[in-house]
């Protein structure tokens, strides 16, 4: 599901795979976000799976102006090498992606950007992987996951030349995830000593605005905090992808590893 495509299928003039979110052409994601933001109550609106090709300045401005829209966006980029983006038919190119991330961060202060990449896609070269790793180092995504390409029967990619071995795909996965773990530790360390607004999901476990359920890290909080409520907590420590907001000497009952760390 591509959330940035919301409403485009109702436009009088049919959109193309690169049409930007534009409410002047009809109902769009920005229309929905503003309507949801106007609803009374205390809640977060979290945007998942936004296709980079459909992002627009209007969408960036709308998110910035709607306080109930979480300062978090999920934007699967899949790769950064033009060679691979073309083979994957991603409707974007390297320079467009680089410029888009800069625009998003400049237009939405405090935004946490989550993305996913695929390694081991047919035809991927060492140069492609090096370019991807350099992009990850430079951009320092707040949240990032990596998938190994899987040759699924019946897909176009399954018939492509240049299929890679499982051993090579595994090696490239380890290479990129090792790099991201270092970056994730840096990102988590920035929160220590700061007060963070969290939503308590279960006794002793909460989630910050920059963490989506199931895929991102957790914030471990005192078990006395009421479940289902927002709370402001002081971050006292960090562990991999997770944050600690516990009194001195208190430890979580157990750590659960985020999927992006697996």
Where are these regions (language model features)?
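Short, small-residue-rich loop/turn micro-motifs
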Residues: 2, 76-81, 148-153, 202, ...
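C-terminal, non-catalytic macromolecule-binding modules
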Residues: 107, 131-170
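Terminal RNA-binding accessory module
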Residues: 159-262
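Conserved, mostly hydrophobic/aromatic
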Residues: 47, 75, 116, 136, ...
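Short beta-alpha junctions and helix-cap segments that line functional grooves
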Residues: 59-60, 132, 221
């Amino acid at each position: 599901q591509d959330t940035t495509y919301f409403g485009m299928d109702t436009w009088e003039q049919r959109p193309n795979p690169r049409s930007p979110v534009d409410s002047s052409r009809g109902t769009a994601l920005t229309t929905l976000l503003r309507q949801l933001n106007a609803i009374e109550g205390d809640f977060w609106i979290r945007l998942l799976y936004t296709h980079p090709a459909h992002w627009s300045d209007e969408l960036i401005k709308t998110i910035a102006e709607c306080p109930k829209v979480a300062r978090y966006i999920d934007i699967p980029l899949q790769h950064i090498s033009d060679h691979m983006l073309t083979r994957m038919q991603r409707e974007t190119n390297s320079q467009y992606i680089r410029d888009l991330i800069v625009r998003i961060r400049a237009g939405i202060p405090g935004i946490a950007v989550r993305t996913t990449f695929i390694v081991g896609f047919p035809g991927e070269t060492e140069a492609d992987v090096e370019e991807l790793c350099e992009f990850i180092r430079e951009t320092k995504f707040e949240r990032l996951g990596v998938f190994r390409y899987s040759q699924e029967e019946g897909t176009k990619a399954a018939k492509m030349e240049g299929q890679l071995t499982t051993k090579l795909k595994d090696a490239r996965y380890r290479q990129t995830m090792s790099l991201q773990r270092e970056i994730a530790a840096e990102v988590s360390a920035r929160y220590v000593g700061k007060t963070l607004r969290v939503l308590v999901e279960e006794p002793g476990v909460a989630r910050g605005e920059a963490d989506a359920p199931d895929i991102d890290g957790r914030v471990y909080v005192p078990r006395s905090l009421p479940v289902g409520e927002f709370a402001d907590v002081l971050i006292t420590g960090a562990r991999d992808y997770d944050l600690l907001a516990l009194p001195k000497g208190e430890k979580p009952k157990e750590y659960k590893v985020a999927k992006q760390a697996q």
